[in-house]
Structures are given as C-alpha cells and as structure tokens.
C-alpha cells in the first residue's frame, strides 16, 4: 500500500477537509486489503469509499456498474480532479475501446469503470489477469437480489472475482437494501468475510409529502410552481402518461422532457444530456426505467402514480438533493393506483410466493401513505431502522393530520359493497350511497337497496377517501379478474358487527399557503446579498461546461459556488480553503473564479 495517508489524498485530490460519517473507517479497511459491504444512502458519499482506497493502493481500481448512462459523467468528474480514469461499455467505438485496453495493460489508469456484461467476457478477464489491480468495487450491489426491482442476472456471476483474485479486496455498495436483501447480497457475491458498514438510511434534507389525488394535473402544476427554474423528476406509471405529462407541463410554461424505454435511443440520449447539462429541466420518466441519474442539484422528485414498493420509492426519491441541500419528495396517489397495482400483481405470471411478496411490499407502501405518524419514522422502519423522534420535515410533522371516527361510514361502505353483489367499482358505490338517480344505478336496481342514499351526509371526495383507506387497511379487496370491483375480506366482518372501531385520516384540502411555505423551505439557500455573485459564478461554470462538453456539476456543485459567493476569496490561497476544490481544479479554474469575485466586489 502507498504511504500517502487517506486524509492527505482527500484534501489534495478531492478538496475536502474531512471524511463524513463512516467513510474514513471504510477507506482504511479496504485500503488495508479487506472486503466490505457498504450500505449508504444516496448523497452519503459512497463513491469516495472506493475511489480513495483505489488511489491509495498500487494498480487500477476496477468499478463494476450497471449504469452505462452514468459512466461517462463519473469518469469526467474524476478527470476534472486529475485522476486517470476511463470506462469500457457498449457505447465506445472499437478504436477507443482498444486504446483504453492498452492503457490498462500499460498501468496508465487509476480507475476503470466497466459494465458487468463486459467484465465477464473471457477476453476482459484475460486482460485483468495481465494487469495490476488495486481493488474491485461492485456498485449498485442490490442488482444481485432476485426479488429486487433492479435484478441483473450477470451480477450472480461476479463471484468469479473472488475465485480468480482472492487476494484483491472487494467493496460492494448499495443505497437501497432492507435487512433480507443485505443478507442476500453478502451470500450471492460471496462476501461472507466482508465487514458490513451500514449507515443510517435517513436523507435529512429531503422533505416527504403525500397528497390524495384530486385533479392530479392541477396538483402537479401547483406543486411545480413552488420549484420554478429548478431541476426535478416526475415519475409516471406508463409511457403514455410520461409523454402526456411532459406535453401538459410544457403548456404550463415548464421546460419538460419525456424519458422512457420506448423512445428512440437518440431521443432518450439527447433528453438525458439536456437534463444533465441544462438548468431547470423537468424530466418525466417511467417508474420502471432506472435512469441512472447522478445530477446533484435535483431539487424535487414527484410521483404522479404509486410506486410498487418502499424500496422503489426510496430509491427514486433518493435522486433528489444529492448535494445535501433542501429537496422535496412529493407523492400524489389515489384509489385508482391501488386498484391498478393490485390487479397487476394478481394477473401476473409470477409464482404464488412472488405474488405474496409483492402484496406485502405494496401493503407496506400503502401503510406509509395512509400513516398519521412522521413519514420518516415509517419509511426508515422499513429498512429496520428506528428514527428516535418526529423529524419536523414531512407533511405529517409540519401539518399534523386530523383523525375522525369513521366506524359508521365504514359500515355503510362495506354494507353497500355486500348488498350490491361485491362486483362494482368505487364510483358506482358512491353514487348508490349518495342517492344518485343516474341510469346505471336504476338499471342495476340499486336505487331499491337498503344502502341507497344512506351516505348523503358525506360528499363524494370524503367517500373516496373512506374507500381508499378501507382498501389500504385490507378491509376491502380488489377483484383480480380485471374489472376493479370491490369485495369484502375476512376482516370486514368485525367492522360490520361493531366489534372493531375504525379511525381514519382526514384528507387535507390543498391550499396555496402550504405551497408558499414549501417554496420557502426547499431549494438551494443563497443569501440575497450573495445572489449576484452566485449567478455570475454559475454563468462561468456554464461556459466552462459548454467548452468541455460536460455537465455543469462535473466542474463544480451549486453548493461549492454558494460557498465561494459567501466567503468571497480574492486570492488562490483563500480559494483553496473553500470546500470541494481540489488541487487540479484550483490550478485549472482558480484564476477565473477569483477574477469574478473581484469584479463583483
């Protein structure tokens, strides 16, 4: 191992004074030649955990990542720091790939990023056997989990690394894994001897908000108005909805782009490039598509449909606020989402074991959505973590929800489901309860039922909330044959007979005051007196990014520019003391940064 201590390298190359959280322990453990399994939330600084030991040890650090779209930016960010980094994946032409292979064999690389399918070829394994390797880093390690939402079969074969190079340390990293998945990762990757480093999964800078669907398009555009000119992601269930949402947002004056697997490759690539390199783009994407977005200044992630699981939700919302600045995770969901997801589970070709797992994951997520306690406490409990007190940064903490005794409305709703034959959807059931005289109610003879018009005391919106919460609590289930009808469950009987009382959450009516508060509370906080200098620095960064054809954040994060604007360094020595500026960036960009600070006074 090289004699350069980790701290010296951290300051000299990366420009940071100190490691964060468990980073130092992980770096020293791996640099000493030991295996590690690292669970750390997005934005926690996972990449430093393998980059620093790779630079401390002799040889090249081999980073295995499934996110091809990310590799180019990750490598460019390292080059900006003066690190000799390259990547090998299917996007490179033969000539470039051959050059990278020559540099690998000649010992001219510090870091090499490679896709798992490329790594596992006989040709590449042969190249590695002729190279000096510092370590193997297996990123996105949850991809090895068969039950996970990102399963990649090639990850199962990565045990070959330990079989062929037992003396080379391996570090596997993931930002999302509940305790069973953690055990599966260790087992499948042959990391029995690895030390586990498990950080808190909390992302304190993200505010969590859940709203009930009630004109979803208007709710989304109202939410986005509090994030004008900020970058964000809007997740939708289907490709069609992605495109419709992007079109709608454009008509509302937002700079929105679509992104899903059905778009032509060049359109996808161009939209992703624009999202990464331009400010204030809203990317509308499918939940199923892993975008591999490493943009640090994503200020919000909005879900217009319910994700399938807590892990999926955590991973998708985790793309917000990677720079540590305030960000928002906003979820808009209604009964229709629940009906659709439950039908998808029942109609799938999966085994009964798999279906049961999917059901419990969905029920867990519904519990989060309907909970009246701190969102953060519920979210983290799903990862086996206890959060000690209410967080003060979620909708339930900021505006505690009211509860109401819904026992009688619940009995009326369940009775109406039973008496109408357990095969009708919510819209029709509400019409019956509220005494509607429409054609369908009369045609079915439901105006003659004892439950007809017994629910006129509640409006349709409240009845939708009652039915939604009954389904979420498994007191009603969705007809899996595809018609979306509701029927009773075994648990319904206790409510109907009065043995079980029902308390429900009273849905909040969205108000603009809440949006204004939201606008004040999230986003990058720059003091008014620093704004002109901050914007001038962003202008220089945009110019440098265009010249080099790289995303702006690869050159400097917003938070670094804000620190410069606050501290106003007028010499290179003073600039060197601002966090996030390593030696290479200081010599490369320092004079121009200092010049702008002096000009702006």
Model-predicted regions and their roles:
Residues 2-13, 17-21, 25-37, 41-47, ...:
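Helicase motor core with emphasis on the C-terminal RecA-like subdomain
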Residues 353-385:
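Short, charged low-complexity linear segments at domain edges
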Residues 1-9, 357-359, 386-601:
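Accessory DNA-binding and partner-docking regions appended to nucleic-acid-acting proteins
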Residues 166, 228, 372, 422, ...:
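Flexible coil/turn residues that form the inter-helical turn or adjacent wing/linker of helix-turn-helix
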